[in-house]
């Protein structure tokens, strides 16, 4: 899965009172908990001359408002997207895959940040500048809130695309999270190529289907 985010015009982001040009990137992710689909990270550098009101935790926003803010962020900020696919999540584990996605998001910013603020209590290794982890940062720092909005919106769109590729799982509704309907579809249809086979509910569904098929053969 690949995502292209149109960028604003290349211009300096000057933070008042700091003297030198300062580019602060907020970083957040979406999709650690689902049983299927990628984890998506976003890095956003806001332009202080183009303020955007209402930025915050994407989970606290209605879908309509989140998409309005998504369009505003794309038009008025620099954005980088990083993705870790299900196979990478299974190979590395979700924590390390998330760190990789965050690092890619920062690397794909069109300008290099001077400081990175990451939501949570861990920092991805290999960032190109000083960084700080902020617990509940999406509610405290506008740039992290913006990254939260970008990451969730991009991931939701990817899961809606997945729903068309793999009908019957309801990805357009639950977005891969472990809802009752999703678990029932797993039991009925088994895992599809975007399921995370290292996750216990997916593994249990696969083992159950294997056991059922083995009993039928026996």
From Swiss-Prot:
InterPro entries: RNase_HII, RNase_HII/HIII, RNase_HII/HIII_dom, RNaseH-like_sf, RNaseH_sf. Signal peptide: none annotated. A divalent metal cation binds at residues 28-29, 119. Its EC number is 3.1.26.4. Its main location: cytoplasm. Its cofactor is Mn(2+); Mg(2+). It comes from Maricaulis maris (strain MCS10) (Caulobacter maris). Residues 22-211 form the RNase H type-2 domain. Manganese or magnesium. Binds 1 divalent metal ion per monomer in the absence of substrate. May bind a second metal ion after substrate binding. Endonuclease that specifically degrades the RNA of RNA-DNA hybrids. Gene3D superfamilies: Ribonuclease H-like superfamily/Ribonuclease H. It comes from the Bacteria. GO terms for cellular component: cytoplasm; ribonuclease H2 complex. This is Ribonuclease HII. Disulfide bonds: none annotated. Belongs to the RNase HII family. One of its GO terms (molecular function) is RNA binding. It catalyses: Endonucleolytic cleavage to 5'-phosphomonoester. Keywords: Cytoplasm, Endonuclease, Hydrolase, Manganese, Metal-binding, Nuclease. It is found in: Cytoplasm. GO terms for biological process: DNA replication, removal of RNA primer; mismatch repair. The gene is rnhB.
């Amino acid at each position: 899965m690949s995502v292209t985010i149109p960028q604003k015009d290349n211009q300096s982001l000057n933070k008042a009172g700091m003297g030198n040009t300062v580019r602060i990137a907020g970083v957040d992710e979406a999709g650690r908990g689902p049983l299927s689909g990628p984890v998506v990270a976003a890095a956003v550098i806001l332009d202080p001359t183009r303020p955007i009101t209402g930025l915050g935790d994407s989970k606290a926003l209605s879908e309509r408002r989140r998409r309005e803010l998504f369009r505003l962020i794309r038009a008025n900020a620099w954005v980088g997207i990083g993705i870790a696919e299900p196979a990478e999540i299974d190979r590395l584990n979700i924590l390390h895959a998330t760190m990789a996605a965050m690092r890619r998001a920062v690397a794909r910013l069109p300008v290099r940040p001077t400081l990175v603020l990451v939501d949570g209590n861990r920092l991805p290794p290999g960032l190109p500048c000083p960084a700080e982890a902020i617990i509940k940062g999406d509610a405290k720092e506008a740039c992290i809130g913006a990254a939260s909005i970008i990451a969730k919106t991009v991931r939701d769109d990817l899961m809606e695309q997945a729903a068309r590729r793999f009908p019957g799982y309801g990805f357009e509704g639950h977005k891969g999270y472990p809802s009752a309907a999703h678990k029932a579809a797993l039991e009925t249809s088994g895992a599809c190529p975007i399921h995370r086979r290292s996750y216990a509910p997916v593994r249990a569904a696969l083992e159950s289907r294997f056991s059922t098929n083995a009993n039928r053969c026996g």
